[in-house]
Amino acid sequence: MKIGKRILLGLVAVCALFLGIIYLWGYKFNIYLVPPSPQKYVRVALKNMDELGLFTDSKEWVETKKKTIEETSNAKNYAETIPFLQKAIKVAGGKHSFIEHEEDISKRSMTKYIKPKAEIEGNTLILTIPEFTGNDSQASDYANFLESSLHKNNYNGVIVDLRGNRGGDLSPMVLGLSPLLPDGTLFTYVDKSSHSKPVELQNGEINSGGSSTKISDNKKIKKAPIAVLIDNNTGSSGELTALCFEGIPNVKFLGSDSAGYTSANQTVYLYDGSTLQITSAFVKDRTNNIYKNFPISPDIQTNNAKSSAIEWIKSQIK
């Protein structure tokens, strides 16, 4: 009987410990014993912003946290807190940070998949690289279309057209273009504590954490001049794709300044299904230039990027 009581007490103690851990730390995994109040919801969101945001060491952030708690103290539901949290996340993470509602996430998942394009003009291969949002099958289709276009066509130079590419999943874009990129570090994420995480390309695979995609042929294409086209609608992952080409000798950037969302967001799920998209790292290119949501400036500023790129490629052919 005594042994049974000890076992029972032990189980009770373990359960109490487990429940205590969930109570104290469950928010990190979006696990709750009971639905959080709107005020708890706000505190959890602010704590995540505090831990991850790039600008949370500032006096402005300290004041913003206090003000946000005060402004939401009488909120009756989660929806009433969102406008205040939207303001707060911009202070914590900068302009690239935002809150995405569950319905917006659902709409985004239904966004029509846009396939990249490949065409030959003269002796130049022109690749149009749209933003990517889609499933793993579409990611594979996207990446392998670009890869096969690079390996199956005859051309003297390549135009990588990233104009209008606002981002999405980085992996299929970079993997599709990987025959043009040297293996090794493409760029590096740098957080507010100066910790670095390189994004690397090796043997047709990338460690960016996006779609699980592989290409059929990772043979490198060398020496071909590459023109990268950007404009003010090239943003986020579109810009990071462009930065993968920075510092490569046979590359020239043409067009206009990019959108200036050169940073990385981390996703945190909230209780109601909304997500915090918190900017947690800036980007360092292979030449050690650090982009803190700065735009990429092209080597050649032009309103006629495509025709200028074709002329530049012609000038590089010997």
UniProtKB/Swiss-Prot annotation:
Q: Does the keyword Oxidoreductase apply?
A: no
State what protein this is by name.
Nisin-resistance protein
Query: What InterPro entries does its record include?
Result: ClpP/crotonase-like_dom_sf (IPR029045), Tail-specific_protease (IPR005151)
One GO biological-process annotation of the entry reads:
response to antibiotic
Organism of derivation: Lactococcus lactis subsp. lactis (Streptococcus lactis)
The record's Gene Ontology cellular component field reads:
plasma membrane
Q: Which UniProt keywords apply?
A: Antibiotic resistance, Cell membrane, Membrane, Transmembrane, Transmembrane helix
Question: Where does the record place it?
Answer: Cell membrane
Query: What is the membrane topology listed in the Swiss-Prot or TrEMBL record?
Result: Single-pass membrane protein
Subcellular location, principal: membrane
* MF terms (GO), sorted A to Z: serine-type peptidase activity
Transmembrane stretches in the record are: 7-28
Gene giving rise to this polypeptide: nsr
Q: What is the lineage of its organism?
A: Bacteria, Bacillati, Bacillota, Bacilli, Lactobacillales
Which Pfam family name is an example for this entry?
Answer: Peptidase_S41
Q: Does the keyword Oxidoreductase apply?
A: no
